[in-house]
Amino acid sequence: MSEQEVLQKNNSPEGKEDRIIGKHVFGNLYDIDAERLNDKEFLEKLVLEAVNIAHMKLVEIKAWSFGGKKGGVSVIALVEESHIALHTWNEYNYATLDVYTCGEDSDPQSAFAHIVNALNPKRYQMFYADRSSQ
C-alpha cells in the first residue's frame, strides 16, 4: 500500500474515509429595495435567522454601516461551521451573499434561500462550490 493510500484511510470502525465536508453557496443579488439594504438591524436579524435555519451554531455576529458613496451594510456571522457574510450597496440596489459551512449537518443552501427570499431581489445568481477535502 502506498503512503498516499495510507493517508486516505480512516481507522474508524465504520471504515469511512476521514475528510472535511465543505459546502460553499454564494451569489449576487440585484435590484433590491434600497431601504432594506441600509437597515443594519433588519439585516443582522435576517442573518441570525439564516444561521438557525441552516442548523449552524453561532459564535459571534457583527454588523457595520458604511456611509457615503458606495455605502451600505456588512453583516458577518462567525459560526462553528464557518461563516455567513452579507454585504450591501444601497446606492446600487445590490448585495453579495456568502454562506460557507463545514460538516454534514449544516445546510448553507437553506440559509442562502432564506436571505434571498427576505430581500426579494428582482434577480440573483447563486453558485455552489464543493470545498470538501476529498
From Swiss-Prot:
Superkingdom of origin: Archaea
Listed GO CC annotations: cytosol
Active-site feature positions: S82 (schiff-base intermediate with substrate), H87 (proton acceptor), C102 (proton donor)
Family in the record: Belongs to the prokaryotic AdoMetDC family. Type 1 subfamily.
UniProt keyword Iron present: no
Gene Ontology annotations of biological process type: arginine catabolic process; polyamine biosynthetic process
Catalytic activity field: L-arginine + H(+) = agmatine + CO2
EC number: 4.1.1.19
Entry comment on modification after translation: Is synthesized initially as an inactive proenzyme. Formation of the active enzyme involves a self-maturation process in which the active site pyruvoyl group is generated from an internal serine residue via an autocatalytic post-translational modification. Two non-identical subunits are generated from the proenzyme in this reaction, and the pyruvate is formed at the N-terminus of the alpha chain, which is derived from the carboxyl end of the proenzyme.
Entry keyword set: Autocatalytic cleavage, Decarboxylase, Lyase, Polyamine biosynthesis, Pyruvate, Schiff base, Zymogen
Protein function: Specifically catalyzes the decarboxylation of L-arginine to agmatine. Has no S-adenosylmethionine decarboxylase (AdoMetDC) activity.
Name of the protein this chain belongs to: Arginine decarboxylase proenzyme
Cofactor binding note from Swiss-Prot or TrEMBL: Binds 1 pyruvoyl group covalently per subunit.
Oligomeric and partner information: Heterooctamer of four alpha and four beta chains arranged as a tetramer of alpha/beta heterodimers.
Recorded GO MF terms: arginine decarboxylase activity
Annotated site (Cleavage (non-hydrolytic)): E81, S82
Pathway terms, separated by semicolons: Amine and polyamine biosynthesis; agmatine biosynthesis; agmatine from L-arginine: step 1/1
Cofactor: pyruvate
Source species of the chain: Saccharolobus islandicus (strain L.S.2.15 / Lassen #1) (Sulfolobus islandicus)
Matches recorded under InterPro entries: AdoMetDC_fam_prok (IPR003826), ArgDC (IPR027549), S-AdoMet_deCO2ase_core (IPR016067), S-AdoMet_deCOase_pro-enz (IPR017716)
NCBIfam families: SAM_DCase_Bsu
Modified residues (Pyruvic acid (Ser)): S82
